């Protein structure tokens, strides 16, 4: 699972990240030929990222390459069940990536476009928001 190696000394539990607005960067396909682009804001957990990656790589089998362009570096906390209110914030439970609309989540290069699109469609079903498949624009390196 993706997550930070070790929280820094004096790690403070963060506030919930802001999901409003569009993505400022990472909104173009840079590494591969195809990409999955988010259309809605969402928190994507490390398990969802891993599940989508497995769905893609199992479909393409060999001959392609997949890049994950997001990283779950935000901790979300949760208090135990049947706990009274107060007595501080809960312990970190999940690691999430704060995704804004327009962000490219995964990129892929594969010789056959049909198989690549089907692999990405399967990965989109594992993600918690609406996404679309984008291609690298002509003229980009």
From Swiss-Prot:
Question: Region Disordered: start and end of each range?
Answer: 1-27
**Keyword Ribosomal protein appears in the UniProt entry:** yes
Spell out the subunit comment. Part of the 50S ribosomal subunit.
The record, for InterPro entries, names: Ribosomal_uL16, Ribosomal_uL16_bact-type, Ribosomal_uL16_CS, Ribosomal_uL16_dom, Ribosomal_uL16_sf
* A GO CC term attached to the entry: cytosolic large ribosomal subunit
Q: Does the keyword RNA-binding apply?
A: yes
Give any single GO term for biological process: translation
Q: Which GO terms describe its molecular function?
A: rRNA binding; structural constituent of ribosome; tRNA binding
| Compositionally biased intervals (Basic residues) | 1-16
Q: Main role?
A: Binds 23S rRNA and is also seen to make contacts with the A and possibly P site tRNAs.
Q: Give the protein name, as stated in the record.
A: Large ribosomal subunit protein uL16
Family, per entry: Belongs to the universal ribosomal protein uL16 family.
* The entry's keywords: Ribonucleoprotein, Ribosomal protein, RNA-binding, rRNA-binding, tRNA-binding
């Amino acid at each position: 699972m993706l997550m930070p190696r070790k929280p820094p000394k004096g790690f403070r539990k963060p506030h919930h990240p802001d999901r409003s607005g569009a993505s400022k960067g990472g909104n173009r396909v840079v590494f591969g030929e195809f990409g999955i682009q988010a259309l809605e804001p969402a928190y994507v957990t490390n398990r969802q990222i891993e599940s989508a990656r497995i769905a893609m790589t199992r479909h393409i089998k060999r001959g392609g390459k997949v890049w994950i362009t997001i990283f779950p570096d935000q901790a979300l906390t949760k208090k135990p069940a049947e706990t009274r209110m107060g007595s501080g914030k809960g312990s970190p439970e999940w690691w999430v990536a704060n995704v804004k609309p327009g962000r490219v989540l995964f990129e892929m290069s594969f010789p056959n476009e049909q198989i690549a699109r089907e692999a990405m469609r399967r990965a989109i079903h594992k993600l918690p928001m609406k996404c679309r498949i984008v291609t690298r624009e002509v003229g980009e390196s």
